[in-house]
From Swiss-Prot:
Protein name listed in UniProt: Redox-sensitive transcriptional activator SoxR
One Pfam family hit: MerR
Recorded GO CC terms: cytoplasm
Domain HTH merR-type stretches: 11-79
Gene that specifies this protein: soxR
InterPro entries assigned: DNA-bd_dom_put_sf, MerR-type_HTH_dom, MerR_fam, Redox-sen_tscrpt-act_SoxR, Tscrpt_reg_MerR_DNA-bd
SUPFAM superfamilies found in the cross-reference section: Putative DNA-binding domain (SSF46955)
Species of origin: Escherichia coli (strain K12)
CDD domains per UniProt: HTH_SoxR
Protein backbone atom coordinates (compact mmCIF):
# COMPACT_ATOMS: atom_id res chain seq x y z
CA UNK A 1 0.00 0.00 0.00
CA UNK A 2 1.36 3.40 -0.98
CA UNK A 3 1.72 6.01 1.76
CA UNK A 4 0.55 9.50 0.98
CA UNK A 5 2.92 12.27 1.88
CA UNK A 6 1.45 15.01 4.02
CA UNK A 7 0.29 17.95 1.97
CA UNK A 8 2.51 20.99 2.36
CA UNK A 9 0.55 24.14 3.10
CA UNK A 10 1.16 26.99 0.68
CA UNK A 11 0.40 29.65 3.29
CA UNK A 12 1.51 29.68 6.91
CA UNK A 13 0.09 31.45 9.93
CA UNK A 14 2.35 33.78 11.90
CA UNK A 15 2.45 31.16 14.68
CA UNK A 16 3.59 28.47 12.25
CA UNK A 17 6.31 30.72 10.82
CA UNK A 18 7.42 31.69 14.33
CA UNK A 19 7.61 28.07 15.44
CA UNK A 20 9.46 26.92 12.33
CA UNK A 21 11.88 29.88 12.19
CA UNK A 22 12.54 30.31 15.91
CA UNK A 23 11.53 33.96 16.09
CA UNK A 24 8.64 35.53 17.96
CA UNK A 25 5.47 36.53 16.15
CA UNK A 26 6.21 40.10 17.23
CA UNK A 27 9.55 39.85 15.40
CA UNK A 28 7.72 38.81 12.23
CA UNK A 29 5.45 41.85 12.56
CA UNK A 30 8.51 44.04 13.14
CA UNK A 31 10.31 42.63 10.09
CA UNK A 32 7.18 43.25 8.07
CA UNK A 33 6.93 46.84 9.32
CA UNK A 34 10.51 47.36 8.11
CA UNK A 35 9.69 45.91 4.68
CA UNK A 36 11.94 42.87 5.13
CA UNK A 37 9.14 40.33 4.68
CA UNK A 38 5.59 40.50 3.37
CA UNK A 39 2.32 38.82 4.24
CA UNK A 40 -1.07 38.60 2.68
CA UNK A 41 -4.41 38.83 4.45
CA UNK A 42 -7.05 36.13 4.36
CA UNK A 43 -10.80 36.80 4.27
CA UNK A 44 -10.77 37.21 8.05
CA UNK A 45 -8.01 39.86 7.73
CA UNK A 46 -5.46 37.54 9.36
CA UNK A 47 -1.85 37.49 8.19
CA UNK A 48 -0.63 34.59 6.12
CA UNK A 49 2.90 34.08 4.88
CA UNK A 50 4.16 32.27 1.81
CA UNK A 51 6.62 29.49 2.64
CA UNK A 52 9.54 31.44 1.15
CA UNK A 53 9.33 33.78 4.16
CA UNK A 54 11.13 31.05 6.13
CA UNK A 55 14.23 31.57 3.99
CA UNK A 56 14.07 35.34 4.38
CA UNK A 57 13.73 35.06 8.16
CA UNK A 58 16.69 32.66 8.24
CA UNK A 59 18.77 35.18 6.27
CA UNK A 60 17.72 38.00 8.60
CA UNK A 61 18.71 35.93 11.65
CA UNK A 62 22.11 35.03 10.15
CA UNK A 63 22.81 38.61 9.11
CA UNK A 64 21.82 39.96 12.52
CA UNK A 65 24.00 37.37 14.24
CA UNK A 66 27.05 38.71 12.41
CA UNK A 67 26.08 42.31 13.14
CA UNK A 68 24.56 43.42 9.84
CA UNK A 69 22.02 46.19 10.54
CA UNK A 70 18.41 45.67 9.49
CA UNK A 71 18.65 48.69 7.18
CA UNK A 72 21.49 47.01 5.28
CA UNK A 73 19.52 43.77 5.08
CA UNK A 74 16.57 45.75 3.74
CA UNK A 75 18.74 47.37 1.06
CA UNK A 76 19.94 43.94 -0.05
CA UNK A 77 16.39 42.57 -0.15
CA UNK A 78 15.22 45.71 -1.98
CA UNK A 79 16.81 44.63 -5.25
CA UNK A 80 14.85 41.37 -5.26
CA UNK A 81 11.36 41.11 -6.75
CA UNK A 82 8.64 40.96 -4.10
CA UNK A 83 7.67 37.42 -3.19
CA UNK A 84 10.76 36.01 -4.89
CA UNK A 85 12.18 32.75 -3.53
CA UNK A 86 15.90 33.23 -3.06
CA UNK A 87 18.10 30.65 -4.75
CA UNK A 88 21.41 29.38 -3.35
CA UNK A 89 23.24 31.36 -6.05
CA UNK A 90 21.41 34.56 -5.12
CA UNK A 91 22.17 33.94 -1.43
CA UNK A 92 25.86 33.64 -2.29
CA UNK A 93 25.75 36.97 -4.14
CA UNK A 94 23.82 38.59 -1.33
CA UNK A 95 26.13 37.36 1.42
CA UNK A 96 29.23 38.41 -0.52
CA UNK A 97 28.01 42.01 -0.21
CA UNK A 98 28.38 41.69 3.56
CA UNK A 99 31.76 39.97 3.51
CA UNK A 100 33.79 43.22 3.43
CA UNK A 101 31.87 44.64 6.39
CA UNK A 102 32.30 41.39 8.30
CA UNK A 103 36.04 41.32 7.55
CA UNK A 104 36.34 44.92 8.83
CA UNK A 105 34.54 44.00 12.05
CA UNK A 106 36.76 40.95 12.54
CA UNK A 107 39.87 43.11 12.04
CA UNK A 108 38.58 45.62 14.60
CA UNK A 109 37.81 42.90 17.15
CA UNK A 110 41.24 41.29 16.70
CA UNK A 111 42.90 44.69 17.18
CA UNK A 112 40.82 45.33 20.29
CA UNK A 113 41.70 41.92 21.71
CA UNK A 114 45.40 42.46 21.02
CA UNK A 115 45.40 45.95 22.56
CA UNK A 116 43.49 45.10 25.73
CA UNK A 117 46.72 44.81 27.70
CA UNK A 118 48.32 47.92 26.25
CA UNK A 119 47.62 51.59 25.84
CA UNK A 120 44.73 52.47 23.56
CA UNK A 121 45.48 56.18 23.37
CA UNK A 122 42.55 57.23 25.52
CA UNK A 123 44.35 60.16 27.10
CA UNK A 124 44.08 58.96 30.70
CA UNK A 125 47.86 59.02 31.25
CA UNK A 126 47.31 56.85 34.32
CA UNK A 127 49.46 53.93 33.23
CA UNK A 128 53.18 54.12 33.83
CA UNK A 129 53.93 53.55 30.15
CA UNK A 130 51.38 56.05 28.78
CA UNK A 131 53.96 58.86 28.78
CA UNK A 132 56.06 56.63 26.51
CA UNK A 133 53.23 55.74 24.13
CA UNK A 134 51.30 59.01 24.28
CA UNK A 135 53.61 61.75 25.60
CA UNK A 136 51.76 64.86 26.72
CA UNK A 137 48.51 63.30 25.47
CA UNK A 138 49.43 64.17 21.88
CA UNK A 139 46.71 61.83 20.66
CA UNK A 140 44.14 64.08 22.33
CA UNK A 141 44.82 66.65 19.61
CA UNK A 142 43.52 64.17 17.04
CA UNK A 143 40.16 63.70 18.72
CA UNK A 144 38.37 62.05 21.59
CA UNK A 145 38.22 58.43 22.66
CA UNK A 146 40.59 55.52 22.15
CA UNK A 147 42.53 57.05 19.25
CA UNK A 148 44.82 54.11 18.52
CA UNK A 149 41.92 51.69 18.10
CA UNK A 150 39.58 54.16 16.41
CA UNK A 151 42.22 55.11 13.84
CA UNK A 152 42.61 51.45 12.86
CA UNK A 153 38.88 51.18 12.22
CA UNK A 154 38.83 54.08 9.75
Amino acid sequence: MEKKLPRIKALLTPGEVAKRSGVAVSALHFYESKGLITSIRNSGNQRRYKRDVLRYVAIIKIAQRIGIPLATIGEAFGVLPEGHTLSAKEWKQLSSQWREELDRRIHTLVALRDELDGCIGCGCLSRSDCPLRNPGDRLGEEGTGARLLEDEQN
